[in-house]
Amino acid sequence: MNFFGIGLPEMLVILAIALLVFGPKKLPEIGRSLGKALRGFQDASREFESEIKREIDRTPATPAEATVEPPVLDSAPTEAVTVEKQTETQV
């Protein structure tokens, strides 16, 4: 039996020390309050997990980015561009 990484011999030693420190009358009360605290922690963690799952299911998936294609030109520009070669002295 392994509980939180503690084996049976270690658990018996801890129980014996608790019995000596708190006494036999106080141990059931401590066990009850410890059990209630653990149950409350488990309930809160389950509630948190279900809330996260609910939020994930509720949020819509982001739409894929729309691709915009550039317009296709029907023809080349009508204006003619003249290119003259200049020598270094003209520049």
Swiss-Prot record:
**Organism's domain of life?**
Bacteria
Q: Name one Pfam family in it.
A: TatA_B_E
What UniProt keywords apply to this chain's record, in alphabetical order?
Cell inner membrane, Cell membrane, Membrane, Protein transport, Translocation, Transmembrane, Transmembrane helix, Transport
Naming one, the record's GO cellular component terms include:
TAT protein transport complex
Task: State which residue ranges cross the membrane.
Answer: 3-23
The molecular function GO annotations come to:
protein transmembrane transporter activity
General function of this protein: Part of the twin-arginine translocation (Tat) system that transports large folded proteins containing a characteristic twin-arginine motif in their signal peptide across membranes. TatA could form the protein-conducting channel of the Tat system.
Protein name according to UniProt: Sec-independent protein translocase protein TatA
